[in-house]
Amino acid sequence: MSLRIYNTLSRALEAFSPIEPGHVRMYVCGMTVYDLCHLGHARSMVAFDVVQRWLRASGHRVTYVRNITDIDDKIIRRAVENGETIRSLTDRMIDALHQDADALGIERPTHEPRATEYVPQMLSMIGRLQDKGLAYQGTDGDVNFAVRKFPGYGKLSGKSLDELQAGERVAVQDGKQDPLDFVLWKSAKPAEPEEVKWASPWGVGRPGWHIECSAMGCEMLGESFDIHGGGADLQFPHHENEIAQSEGATGKPFSQVWMHNGFINVDNEKMSKSLGNFFTIRDVLKEYDAETVRFFVVRSHYRSPLNYSDVHLNDARGALKRLYTALSLVAPAEVAVDWNHPAAARFKAAMDEDFGTPEAVAVLFELAAEVNRSKSAETAGLLKALAGCLGLLQGDPQAFLQAGTSEMDAGAIEAQIAARAAAKAAKDWAEADRIRKALLEQGIVLKDSPAGTTWEAAAKG
């Protein structure tokens, strides 16, 4: 079975075949770096990290581009509020982004272009659009895209021009010929910092948001590439506008496949600052370990809405603990995955059907159950290898199981285990039981086996 991906453009599952055999070129819209990453960013980063991992596991070379928007109205406002330069703000937020991504086990993209480094390419694309009659300079000095002159506009969102409304980031201005037209080049405003002003054939100004991704995508991956991804909130207007700009300029299909990850809710409500349920990745990592957060994201399908709650995170922690418990029973063998193995074949079938991580995770639990029964190092090795395709179970099992025991350090716990062993050797069962109960009250669960006693953190809840 070959890989099939749900293509937002066709609204159907399609067999995937890269334009260049064996080489997948993928572009994903990254962060606008004016603040810390939030849960929505975590969802997108993990989703497309899994995509690129599976493409590589399937034998493809992957060129993965995830851009950074480092010039934007929000960035300008935040820098002015903070009394710092835009470069200072964006550098700081990019460092924070990398720290958060590293914590979640996100592999770095092949390229991470900053919009401000590709202004010449943006100017070139705007010029091509103007030459083709698809762009014009308004009376206010801005250069706009003439939406109604591009015949394919609306094909991604599936709406006619009459249905479409100007999107959240598309400000309707006096200089536009049509409310649906969107800005390609913003003329400079007197109060704006000098560091956001570039010379252009249309006067000093800065690029619009949409042209940034079109120019960077074409520059780094070519005028036609394989996969373009991002959150569902970007489908319109951002991705619709990217298609119009890119295909309007080049006359070629921009991306073969368009992928969109689902929204994230908090306790069944949309996450927003106004509702007081807005969480940064760092907020969440204060309460839960990073692999639990990653597992919480991975075990839902990337296109499904994801509901964040303490109940779901604690459940994810407990589920991940069961997998690590299996790996703690026997040292996993180093194995090269045999995709004809029944469990590996089921895992592959799940991932090849639009990156079906819920079904793939179910296979991991089947293997964990087999490890619990057989104590097979080869089965444990297969479990670890398949989980690695999802960026999971690569840590030390005992370290994971023992994490979160804040009141007692490991040395104190081991001392109590030794005291309990001495009590049992002396047949002082009451003392041995007292120590076990005292540790349990501290959140420590003891596990006796013929090989000795181990411990782990008790499940929260």
Swiss-Prot record:
Keywords: Aminoacyl-tRNA synthetase, ATP-binding, Cytoplasm, Ligase, Metal-binding, Nucleotide-binding, Protein biosynthesis, Zinc. It is found in: Cytoplasm. InterPro entries: Cys-tRNA-ligase, Cys-tRNA-synt_Ia_DALR, Cys-tRNA/MSH_ligase, CysS_C, Rossmann-like_a/b/a_fold, tRNA-synt_1_cat_dom, tRNAsynth_Ia_anticodon-bd. A motif ('KMSKS' region) lies at residues 270-274. ATP binds at K273. It catalyses: tRNA(Cys) + L-cysteine + ATP = L-cysteinyl-tRNA(Cys) + AMP + diphosphate. A motif ('HIGH' region) lies at residues 31-41. Its EC number is 6.1.1.16. GO terms for cellular component: cytosol. Zn(2+) binds at C29, C213, H238, E242. Binds 1 zinc ion per subunit. SUPFAM superfamilies: Anticodon-binding domain of a subclass of class I aminoacyl-tRNA synthetases, Nucleotidylyl transferase. One of its GO terms (molecular function) is ATP binding. GO terms for biological process: cysteinyl-tRNA aminoacylation. Gene3D superfamilies: Cysteine-tRNA ligase, C-terminal anti-codon recognition domain, HUPs. PANTHER family: CYSTEINE--TRNA LIGASE, CYTOPLASMIC, CYSTEINYL-TRNA SYNTHETASE. Monomer. Belongs to the class-I aminoacyl-tRNA synthetase family. NCBIfam families: cysS (TIGR00435). This is Cysteine--tRNA ligase.
